[in-house]
Amino acid sequence: MTYRPSSPYAPPRRSRRPSLPRPPRRPRLTRRGRLALLLGAVLAVAVGVGVPLLLTRDEPAVEPARTLLVPEGWRARQVYTAVDRALGLPEGTARKTATAPAAALALPRAAGGNPEGYLFPATYPVTGGTTPQGLLKFMVDTAAKRFGAARIVAGAKAQGLSVYQTVIAASIVQAEADNPEDMAKVARVVHNRLARGMALQMDSTLNYALGRSTVDTSYEDTRIRNPYNTYERKGLPPTPIGNPGDQALDAVIRPTDGDWLYFVTVAPGDTRFTADYARHQENVAEFNANRGAERG
């Protein structure tokens, strides 16, 4: 599906373990950083934005078509790097542009000026006249239109969340789900744990805090003092941990019915959801065995 927003420029996983012995590596309860390593699978579902705008000067009559793809789940820093490379600018230019007051990005007040979560995943046109400010502004404007749709606003309210909280939850679902089919189940786990006052304990939030992407989380990682450590802090993290797409957002406002509190991807394509902690521990043991075999 290709999304073409209107433009005036357009031409004609898991629970706390207080009683368990300290393991050498923290068992993985949720899907984590594989997304950044599997971008190729994401490209097929990226939303296309085929509007030739973002210009500040006249363009040549004929110019080779170029595009910038922002895959679902990319973090802001990844988007900034891609923008700099696409426009041939020094590294850090897009980041500085995004945080400058002159950028005038249409972010919600709750974002506190942080564009994370609002750099909408899509395919954007790039020309010789494209500027980082114009490109980032178009990403944010696109996100604002998508997230501000009546069904999203109503769906967020039905789940007891603000739209910004919904984007935060969607960014977690985007990072944790092993595949799109699991997103609505992962979203249900998030909702169930929030409703019970349980810490989310999502490894994807730790990865964000530590600026990495990995499938291994140590016990020490879960003890870091950081607002994105959802092992130590209850509730949602303060901001999105990436830029979610439509499927993750839809999963949060329309989660699958279920009583699940835990999940673990024991192998690619095999994610186990359960409300029973003992059963979950069995699944975790299988995951650990598989990881051990991978390491040799």
Q: What residues fall within each predicted segment?
A:
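Terminal targeting segments of Actinobacterial cell-envelope proteins
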Residues: 1-33
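Core subunits and conserved enzymes of cellular information-processing
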Residues: 2, 65, 82-85, 258, ...
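Helix-turn-helix-type domain boundary/helix-start signal
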Residues: 27-28, 68, 159
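Signal peptide-directed extracytoplasmic domains
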Residues: 32-37, 46, 52-151
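Bacterial extracytoplasmic/cell-wall-associated proteins, especially those involved in peptidoglycan
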Residues: 106-296
